[in-house]
Curated annotation (Swiss-Prot):
GO terms for molecular function: acetylcholine receptor inhibitor activity; ion channel regulator activity; toxin activity. Belongs to the three-finger toxin family. Short-chain subfamily. Type I alpha-neurotoxin sub-subfamily. This is Short neurotoxin A. Residues 1-21 are annotated as: Disordered. SUPFAM superfamilies: Snake toxin-like. CDD domains: TFP_snake_toxin (cd00206). Its main location: secreted.
Length: 62
């Protein structure tokens, strides 16, 4: 699997995930800087108030 891993509005970058990892995630929340977006491999557990989208195809988490 290949997932995007660039933060927020940075230029797009992606990375290959470890063998057996088939998910990518896009996690969003707001703080004093505005909306923060984190992307990567896997499908993490998040705290309430954080928007999480997980998907199962290459570069699906933009």
């Amino acid at each position: 699997r290949r997932c995007f891993n660039h933060p927020s509005s940075q230029p797009q970058t992606n990375k290959s995930c470890p063998p057996g990892e088939n998910s990518c995630y896009n996690k969003q929340w707001r703080d004093h800087r505005g909306t923060i977006i984190e992307r990567g491999c896997g499908c993490p557990t998040v705290k309430p108030g954080i928007k999480l989208r997980c998907c199962q195809s290459d570069d699906c988490n933009n």
